[in-house]
């Protein structure tokens, strides 16, 4: 890049521009322990420049997202059948990962048995498929890191960092002589709007099920973490819901669910006790890992919500469809073919997969165990749960496995490491400090799918995200402290 690196004075000016634009436009996060001063937000960790991504790779990721949406909708539908392969697989996984998958599975079974349960046929999947661009074979190819089915974040802030970099370019802040990028090659995501649109569509679907006695103005309940640091990302969706779609929303923790909500015994409808507002959609921005459930009361709150007639985004089965075990099984063409019969679609999905091994007593599982212990440098060990910081990398794998009983190994998958290109022409800004180190970038593609027990009713690509991290960091979670938000310049 001809204008890189910037001089010290140029960099200082750019840092000031980034900070001022971010504060003006809400590109923000709360720092740790912000509760003592809730007015003390900080600028989200970001790159100063956009990162080059091959247009071919970006287009492939966008085009395949509706296929992934359809796939995971079909998987969820199938998991509801007690005699299905994936129902039985998840049942077995619940035994090996009793702390998390087992808890979610037991809640699902308890929901079905509850006298209070009122079945809601609609499900809303708000998904994100994450990729690294692999360069191993000399060509650039998107390879899936994971498919997220619950609490996908940064749709709101992603579009802001895209607009930040576009502003810096168009306002000649990168170079006073003029823009250094073709603005048409800068991706501007509409993910904050598109996720809100999906939530609003779910509200309309809920209303369409009701008789005239239904509340005319049901709302969306955001179920959020206590002391949520990433609140401004979520606020983008809340504001869009109200301003673009006329839909109100409320933020509730699991504590609030226990204290403030009730279910009508006859209809199963979910209401806020004090205001009697009817909740049409329960949208989870928490509940994706064990630390989100701090006590048995939190699990009880999740069960309470699942029993209601509100549409869940996601419900328990949809969340469980995103387990790493199912990701591993889908790399088997025979398993994938049960859900996607179209040969071209199936081939396009398979191209995005790397080798993933179980660690069970199957032939493939025994090979996975051998590789984990004898060739760990090529692999990452992943548990079922989401969120940054849960994975075990390379040479740390053997000692980690030796530290747990072998009967628990099948709660993990062994995934081939992807080898992405390094970008040495960018600068990360975090806490007003700049870091000029090689970075790796992960492309996220959002997708929203509304479906029932038999059909996919709405299926859309819903925007993009780019997150970058230092080459020396294994994890990439921005809120977890490992990475930063970035934007895309296509080439």
From Swiss-Prot:
One of its GO terms (biological process) is glutathione biosynthetic process. Its EC number is 6.3.2.3. Mg(2+) binds at residues 146, 148, 386. One of its GO terms (molecular function) is magnesium ion binding. ATP binds at residues 146, 324, 382-391, 393, 415-418, 442, 469, 475. Binds 1 Mg(2+) ion per subunit. Its cofactor is Mg(2+). It is an enzyme of class 6 (ligase). It catalyses: gamma-L-glutamyl-L-cysteine + glycine + ATP = glutathione + ADP + phosphate + H(+). Signal peptide: none annotated. Gene3D superfamilies: 3.30.1490.50, 3.30.1490.80, ATP-grasp fold, B domain (3.30.470.20), Glutathione synthase, substrate-binding domain superfamily, eukaryotic (3.40.50.1760), Glutathione Synthetase, Chain A, domain 3 (1.10.1080.10). Present with 3430 molecules/cell in log phase SD medium. Homodimer. This is Glutathione synthetase GSH2. It comes from Saccharomyces cerevisiae (strain ATCC 204508 / S288c) (Baker's yeast).
